[in-house]
Structure formats: C-alpha cells, structure tokens
Amino acid sequence: MLSTYGEILRLNRAWRFSAAGFILRLPMSIMPISIILSIQAAYGNYTLAGAVSAINIIALAVTAPMWARLVDRYGQLKVMGPVFAVSAVATIVLFVATLQMASPSILFVSAGIAGATWGSPGALVRARWIRTTDTVSQLNSAFALEAAVDEFVYIVGPVVATVLGTVLHPTTGVAVSIVFLSVGAALFLSQRSSEPIPLGKAGRGARATSDGTEGSKDAAADAKGAAASAPARERSLLLL
C-alpha cells in the first residue's frame, strides 16, 4: 500500500500539491478548540467561547458548497486566492480582538467571516488528483490517500491545539492556524500546472458532465473519463 501511495505521489510531482493541501487543511481541526481556549482564557466565559467557535464552523459549512461551484467555474487560484486572503485577515482580527478583550460582536463577526471564507481544501486537492492521474486505479489510490490524510488531520489537530493552548499560550493555536493557512494557501495555489481547467475556459469536449464537473482530459478518448465520472462529479461537494 505504501509503495502504491509513493507511486501516485511521484506522478507529475503530485506530492507537492498534496503536501501543500495537508498544511492548508490543518487549521480546520486546530481552530475550533483554539478559539474556545483563547476566548475562555481572555473572557472567562465558556458560553461565549463555544458560541464564537460554533459561528466559525457553521459559516464554513454553509458557504463551502458555494465556493466549490465558483471554483469549478472560474478556477482555484482566481476564486480561492482572494478568499483565503480574507480568511487570514479575519482570523488575525479574531486573534487581536481576543488579546485585547474587544467587544464580543467583533469576535462573532471576525470568526464568521474567517469560517465563511475557508472553502473546502480537501475538495481542491481531490480535484487536482482527477487532473493528475491517468487510470481509475491511480485515482482510487489517490482518493484513499487523501481520506487517510483527512483522518490524520482530524485526529492530530485537536491534540496540537490543546497542547499549544495549555503549554504555551491560549491564543497560540489561533496564531499557528494563521501561519498554516497563509503558507499552505500560497504553496498550494502557486502550483498552476496541476490546477484543473475552469469550466468557463474549457472547451465543449473537455466537459465530462453538465452538472459542474470539468473534464481535464478528452472524455471521448480517455477511458478514465467514463469510469471516473462518478467520483469526479462529486468532487465539488466533497467536504472535510
């Protein structure tokens, strides 16, 4: 199994966007607990801390499908570049507001914006695998690898957040999330060669389906296109 993963990671240097996607996903599991720890330490109020963290998560869940549709139409860099920038700025505002014990309304607004401008990094990575792999077997292995990465992120993230928030400073987890978001987004979006072709630019022959899935290769000539159309069709709605 490890040798199989090694083979697909070497396809067109796919390990580069996969590793960047891993970094980009880490804040998703670090932020919720970090928000609770930092706000509770500053305000001494678990109710406020839980509410702000909940707003962040709800905003993410509500807006992720919208960003997925826009990414399919206009491309990952064009859409998610500005979106990730706004998310980073909003998280910085949340970080500073917590340290300064600002009005709770600022916490709610900044946390909501930070979550609403997060999107679904896992779906972005999977879309690149669809473009990178050549066979259904390779695509299945790639998706299995990303599923393992998802599990690792969700297991390790809360542990990292707890250790950082208790051993160092309650706001450390939020600060680290800002770094991971900024670095991960820059590394991931800068890799243009693996970015899927937006539907707005793809020719009629490059469209595998009519429901928002782009076909990165000629669907009529490539057997993978027909066999992998089902998982590809779902990629825009894949949420971590």
Where are these regions (language model features)?
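C-terminal ends and interior cores of transmembrane alpha-helices
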Residues: A85-M101
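Transmembrane alpha-helix termini and helix-breaking/packing motifs in multi-pass membrane transporters
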Residues: V156-S177
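Symmetry-related core transmembrane helices of the 12-TM Major Facilitator Superfamily/SLC fold
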Residues: T172-S190
